[in-house]
Design a protein with these regions (language model features):
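C-terminal membrane-cytosol helix-exit motif in multi-pass small-molecule transporters
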Residues: 6-26, 217-221
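Juxtamembrane intracellular "pre-TM" segments in multi-pass secondary transporters
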Residues: 19-53
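Pair of pore-lining "gating" transmembrane helices in MFS-fold secondary transporters
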Residues: 44-64, 140, 144-148
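Helix-loop boundary and gating motifs at the non-cytosolic
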Residues: 59-78
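Loop-to-transmembrane helix entry
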Residues: 76-94, 171-175
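Helix-to-loop junctions at the C-terminal end of transmembrane segments
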Residues: 97-111, 195
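C-terminal transmembrane helical hairpin of 12-TM major facilitator-type secondary transporters
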Residues: 112-157
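A late C-terminal transmembrane helix in Major Facilitator Superfamily
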Residues: 163-200, 204-207
């Protein structure tokens, strides 16, 4: 499997080198100045902070589920191995299918609606995980919901940020994605701790709480 992954990465590297255009940097200055400019942008644009934080919380909820799913599936009544968990991961293709639709309709339906809808889908997923966590049906249904919900939240928060300052689009994306993965790491840490202390119910509570916080931020900000 690792050899296959290595081969695929090499193919991707060649394709990226051959296909993507060579763009000249639009920032002049030292690397240290470039890094400092990230904090300047974060301070300058409140919308960047808003979008980054609520997306990070939702991603923390998302990652909290995937970080502990293998532990859950190894227990009764499943006694399943990593192969089954990998097959469940294929359900995530639902997010990839909906990504195109979401991207096309952000401007028409609005960031606020997509964030609320995505958070509600995630909360519904955690409800399924809580009520039917010992059955494949609710687990699969929850995976579909949590993945589509995450796509709604990520894309609707990320895409509008590029319009804040087109000349600094790459740096703005760096800030967003850094916050995004910090949120994912936090969710993984919290869910792992919750699993050790409280089992699956602790994971469900942690994931639902992170999503609820993301939704509350959206409702309070009203944007």
């Amino acid at each position: 499997m690792y050899y296959i992954a290595t081969g695929m990465m090499l193919v991707c590297a060649v394709l990226v080198f051959r296909i993507l255009p060579d763009e000249k940097p639009n920032f002049t200055g030292s690397y240290a100045a470039l890094m400092r400019s990230l904090f300047t942008l974060l301070k300058q644009y409140p919308l960047l902070r808003l979008h980054s934080v609520r997306a990070a919380l939702a991603f923390g909820s998302f990652m909290g589920f995937w970080a502990t799913l293998a532990f859950k599936m190894a227990q009764e009544p499943f006694h399943a191995g990593s192969d089954v968990v990998g097959m469940l991961g294929l359900c995530g293709i639902a997010g990839a299918v909906t990504a195109s639709f979401i991207g096309k309709h952000i401007a028409r339906l609005g960031v606020y609606r997509f964030n609320c809808f995505g958070a509600l889908l995630q909360l519904a997923a955690w409800g399924l995980f809580a009520a039917g966590g010992n059955h494949y049906g609710p687990i699969i249904g929850g995976i579909l919901l949590v993945d589509i919900g995450m796509q709604c939240i990520q894309l609707s928060n990320q895409a509008p940020l590029f319009e804040l300052c087109p000349s600094a689009a790459n740096r703005i994306n760096t800030i967003f994605m850094s916050c995004y993965f910090i949120g994912g790491s936090l969710g993984t840490l919290l869910s792992g701790t919750a699993w050790v202390l409280f089992g699956w119910s602790g994971v469900v509570g942690t994931g639902a709480l992170l999503t609820a916080l993301s939704l509350i931020i959206t409702l309070v900000a009203k944007r």
